[in-house]
Structures are given as C-alpha cells and as structure tokens.
Amino acid sequence: MQDDLFGSPEAPTPPVPSRHSTRPTKADAPEAAEHAAPPAPRKRSSQVTAMAHDDALTALAAALPRQLRLGTSSWTYPGWKGLVWEGEHSDTQLSKQGLAVYAQHPLMRTVSIDRSFYRPLTVSQYESYASQAPDDFRFVVKAPSVVTDALVRSEDGRGRQANPAFLSPELVRSECVEPALQGLGHKLGALVFQLSPLPLAQLDRLPLLLERLRTMLLALPALAPTAPDGVIAVEVRDPEWLTPDFAAVLREAGATYCLGLHAKMPPLQAQLPMLRALWPSPLVCRWNLNPVHGPYGYEEAERLYAPYDRLHHPDLPTRSELASVIAGITRRGQNAFVTISNHAEGCAPLTVRGVADEVAAVLAAAPR
C-alpha cells in the first residue's frame, strides 16, 4: 500500500536538462524583426489587476483535490505579468497589492511567506497578509533563521560563531508560533522549520541535536485549536538527518517531515522513506532549487532565470514523481501543502501549472 502511495522506490536517474531557454533565440526570429523600431516604453499601472484566466485553467483547478494547496515561494516578481497579473508593476507595488491578486489565481491556494525567515514578523504583519487572502487560502510560514540556524552568519552567509538561540523553545514560541497563530488564525497552513546546513562538528553530534529538536517541538503550542489545518514541518539541508531516529522525534511531537527538493538533498525518491515512516501525515513540500545548479547554485539560478517569466530547465521527472506522491496522499484524505520557487525551473507559476497538469492526469488514470 505504501509503495503505491508514495510511488515506486526505484526510479531512473533524471536526465540533466538543457541549460538553454525554451524560448526562441533572436536567431530564430524573422529577419525583418532586426529592423523593427524598438517598442515604446511601457507605463506601469498604479493598480495591480488579476489576469483573466481561460476556461482550461479553471477546469484544471476544479479537477484537483480540495486537500491540495499549490503555490509559490513569495509573490513579488514583476516577471509574472501575463501569468498572474496584468501589466508592468514594481516590486514595491507587488509587495503591497500583489498577494490579493495572486490569491485570485485558480491554482494558487497557498503561498510561502519567505521573508519571515530573515526577520521575525509581527502579529499585525501576519494579520495584513491574512486580510488579503480568501477564507479557504492557507499560508506556509518559514520560521526565522535566528532559531533555525546553528550559526550566526555574516552578510555573505559565512558562519561566524555558534548561535545560542538555535532551537530555543522560548524564542520559537514568542518570535514565530504565537505571532503566526494570532495573525493568520485559521489561515495558517504549514509552519516550516528549515534547519540550515550544519558545520561538520555539529553533524558529528547529531544525537544531541535530535534531543534539542525534540525538546523544542514538544514545547510548542498546539496549532489545531486556532488553525485546524495547521501542521509543524521540519526541513533539513543535510542528508545525515534522514534517519529512523529523526522520524521518531517528529512522530512523537506530532510534526512531519518537509520534503525538500533541493540540490543539497537526495532526490525525491530517496526521501520517501521519511514520508512512509511518518504515515499517515499531511504532505509539506518545498521545491527550491534545480539540481543542475549544484548545492550552492542560488546565485547562478538567479542570474540565469531572472526575471522569472519563462521555464529554463523543466524537470519533468520530478514533476511526475511529485504528482504521484500528491495524488496518493490526497486520495487518502490528507492535506498537501506544496510551494515552488522560481529557482526550481525558472518560473514558479508555470511549474505550478505543470505539476497541476500531472496531478490531474494521475487522478484521471486511477481506477475508481
């Protein structure tokens, strides 16, 4: 049953996609285009308005299970014009008005609030986000790095010294869980603790860190009274965490594993034993970075993919495997929170559409 639920444990190694864009190059354009007058500068609108979506997109959304909440990592990307909103808009405009428009997209039923990772947010900030989303929308919140990073880091990301606040139960409650619960209320979906890569000295003491994590998780207030769909999830960036002992800690605390699709981690199939060990449990997945860029390839992905208006490296095997996991879990009544970064394939809204197509196809092919 569980092999069917989470997909086959064996999967072929995905081919490395081409590094070339899926759009035609200038050399492919008609010769006359070289002599065309440059387009007039486009004026930015003062109001962000939603794209009019076609019937096919609306039908696709209706074919997806209600337990599935697909979305992106943040929403303030001007390059999403024509996909999520109309016209040209600045980052500042989208920061203020973009969420309400984003939440009107038929496929976008969640979003990851990534800025909370860099600095704790206040109750009023969370309340502002909640007020811009419909009642059925759910937020994925990243716990601040002040409690999820074992190191205090410099501006360039290098670790300088041990972080005394790492996994502090008191700070986690006051700086993360309580503000998110109070501000988002029932719209809180997944609260994700992304544990940053550990120095080698700490990896050698992983049993001690597991006990520290256990203490922190057990000290957290229950989410369900305020947020019935709320779930605590732990994401890691070191494969050494993926052990039965880690699964036991999560199970005891009523938390789940965040499936992290990132070049620092093993591929999706290799992480499925963690999901099996915690079953039944909601799915929380963050698709972060295409492996073609390597484990430290964020800057390379940003340079290549910006302004995030098209797909550059479609990862069709990962889409297919993820869709199978989503379909298996939601068919059995569990929620699924899946957020996708622009760094996954180049344009998060298009990847969301691709995953949605795959999920709909899996469900349509399943015996009834």
Regions found by a protein language model. Name each.
Residues 1-368:
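Residues lining hydrophobic/aromatic ligand-binding pockets adjacent to catalytic sites
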